[in-house]
Amino acid sequence: MEMKQISETTLKITISMEDLEERGMELKDFLIPQEKTEEFFYTVMDELDLPENFKDSGMLSFRVTPRNDRIDVFVTKSEINKNLNLEDLSDFDDISKMSPEDFFNTLEETMREKGDAAALDKLAEIEKREEEKTQQEKGETKEKRDYVHFVLDFPNIQQVINFAKTVDYDVEASELFKESDAYHMTVLLNLEDKPDYYADLMFARMLEHAGRGTKTRAYLLEHGVQLIKADALQELQMIG
C-alpha cells in the first residue's frame, strides 16, 4: 500500500489487489455490510500512519476507484453524517450482477444521501486532476523516437513527381514502389533535435500532395516492384 498527501485535507491511498487478497478481502466486501469491512479500513489507517492533521479529525469521506491491478482510495476530511450505518447498504440490488464500477458508484450514491455531497464532489474533481497529471507525466517520460517513416499513395507517376517537387525539408531516405496500377513512396525522417510535434506537422504537409498509405513497407517489398531505392525524392526532383 502507498499513501500520497495531495493537500492539507486530502490523501490518496493505493491498495494493490495483492494487499486485498493478503487480508482476505474482495471488491464486493466494500458493499456487503460486515465487520471485516470496517476493520479493514481501520487497519489501513493504522498501518499508513496518517498525517497529524488527519488524526482525530472527525469523519472522513472516501472515494474508491477500481483499477486493473489496484484500487485508488481518495480520502478527505468531511462532515458526513456520523450515523452512516453499514446496514444501510443491505438495500442495494443484487451485487453479484454488478461490475466493480457499479459497486462503487452505488456506494457513492448512498454516501451522498447520508452526508456531505460537497466533499464527494471535491474528491471527484481531485481524482480527475490526478488522472490528468498522471497521463501528462507518462507522455513526458515516453521515450522519444529517433526516426519515423511514412508510406504515401499516388494514382500515377506524374503526381509522384509533383509531390517530390514540393518537398523542401530534410528527408533521411525515400523509396518508390509500384504495385498493381498505383505508386507508393516511403519517406524516412530524422527526428533528432526536432520538437515533439514535428512528425505530425511533416505528415500533414505530405498529405497535401499525396494520399495516406494503404500498404506497409513490408508488403511493398514482398508484393511490389521497387523502382528507386534510398534517394527517390532527390532523383524525382531532377526530372524537368
Swiss-Prot record:
Entries under Pfam families matching the protein: MecA (PF05389)
InterPro entries assigned to the protein according to its UniProt record, in alphabetical order: MecA_C_sf, Neg-reg_MecA
GO molecular function, one term: protein-macromolecule adaptor activity
Subunit comment: Homodimer.
Domain remarks in the Swiss-Prot or TrEMBL record: The N-terminal domain probably binds unfolded/aggregated proteins; the C-terminal domain interacts with ClpC.
Role description: Enables the recognition and targeting of unfolded and aggregated proteins to the ClpC protease or to other proteins involved in proteolysis.
Family membership noted in the UniProt record: Belongs to the MecA family.
NCBIfam families: PRK02315.1-4
HAMAP family assigned: MecA
Protein's name according to its UniProt entry: Adapter protein MecA
Name of encoding gene: mecA
